[in-house]
């Protein structure tokens, strides 16, 4: 089984915690997780992947972080067709509209969003959110 990448941006550590839980799920299912902060990642590593995960908290008016994550996602959109992508993020306010938009964006690029929607957590992820992240990792490992 090849590496399954989990690439994220985290400002407070909440999304990083979720990335760790996704990796735990991948490993529990027998896969190998390669967890990277988006600032040290290249979208090129995902081109040959069948499945991977992306995580980013809601920023500003419910959008992706603009400095590193948005440009990364724009690159991924160019080759997302046929891939299974797990999405996860945390938020402070709102109702997760950014996640619905992000999932729709990936689907419009031809990807399948694992589980049909992303995993979200309000601020610090609770055990339910972390368990959902682990399940997401297991789903990605099965692709």
Where do the protein language model's features map onto the residues?
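Short polar catalytic/cofactor-binding loops
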Residues: 9-13
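FMN-binding flavodoxin-like domain, especially the glycine-rich phosphate-binding loop
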Residues: 3-4, 14-17, 23-38, 45-143
């Amino acid at each position: 089984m090849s590496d399954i990448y989990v690439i994220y941006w985290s400002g407070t550590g909440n999304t990083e915690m979720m990335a760790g839980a996704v990796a735990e799920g991948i490993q529990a299912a027998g896969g190998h997780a390669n967890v990277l902060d988006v600032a040290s990642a290249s979208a090129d590593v995902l081109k040959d992947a069948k499945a991977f995960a992306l995580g980013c908290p809601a920023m500003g008016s419910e959008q992706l972080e603009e400095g590193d994550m948005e440009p990364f996602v724009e690159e991924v959109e160019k080759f997302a067709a046929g891939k299974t992508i797990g999405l996860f993020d945390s938020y402070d306010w709102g109702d997760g509209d950014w996640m619905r938009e992000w999932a729709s964006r990936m689907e419009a690029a031809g990807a399948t969003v694992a589980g049909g929607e992303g995993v979200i957590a309000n601020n610090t992820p609770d055990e339910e959110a972390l368990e959902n992240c682990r399940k997401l990792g297991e789903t990605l490992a099965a692709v």
